[in-house]
Amino acid sequence: MWGVVATATYETVYISFASTLLAVLVGVPVGIWTFLTGKNEILQNNRTHFVLNTIINIGRSIPFIILLLILLPVTRFIVGTVLGTTAAIIPLSICAMPFVARLTANALMEIPNGLTEAAQAMGATKWQIVRKFYLSEALPTLINGVTLTLVTLVGYSAMAGTQGGGGLGSLAINYGRIRNMPYVTWVATIIIVLFVMISQKLGDTLAKKVDHR
């Protein structure tokens, strides 16, 4: 039994981290682009900003369980199946991408207005402004955002597990409910809570470590 619990725990960790990584790889650049094309920013483009903003808002407004069903054909096309841990990563990462993009854009909006002028006065290029000034200044907030995304996806992964995605959610359903072993549900819940608490603590510690403000 404990071997099954260990496997389910590994699956949840795998799903959560892989989904977060994909969401960050797409969401952070989109969030940066959204911010940079905003009003009075260095790449201001009202049309592009409007399109990106609209896509992000639409993506964030769709409930995960509905998005999970909508993306079944996409998941089947990419992975070859809609069941299993790898298949669960597709809807989870797509669900989190607009969330990460919004967190990134908001983090950059918190940067003091005078930073751009100071960077330009030092002769920095637009790319240097983004990399050495904006991202450096916003890094603690971005780390907090990634941590929030990870712990959110842990909960969503349990939801995906009830639809055949594997992990602790699937364990709780298959053993706790169907096989009438309620203690398994409690074990799965405790493991999820511990994973979230540890992830949050590590994220908070890292954010404080890189915060030199």
From Swiss-Prot:
It is a multi-pass membrane protein. Pfam families: BPD_transp_1 (PF00528). Keywords: Cell inner membrane, Cell membrane, Membrane, Transmembrane, Transmembrane helix, Transport. The keyword Iron-sulfur does not apply. GO terms for cellular component: plasma membrane. It is found in: Cell inner membrane. Residues 9-202 form the ABC transmembrane type-1 domain. The chain crosses the membrane at residues 13-33, 50-72, 89-109, 139-159, 183-203. InterPro entries: AA_ABC_Transporter_Permease (IPR051322), MetI-like (IPR000515), MetI-like_sf (IPR035906). CDD domains: TM_PBP2. SUPFAM superfamilies: MetI-like (SSF161098). Part of the binding-protein-dependent transport system for D-methionine. Probably responsible for the translocation of the substrate across the membrane. This is Probable D-methionine transport system permease protein MetI. It comes from Haemophilus influenzae (strain ATCC 51907 / DSM 11121 / KW20 / Rd). The gene is metI.
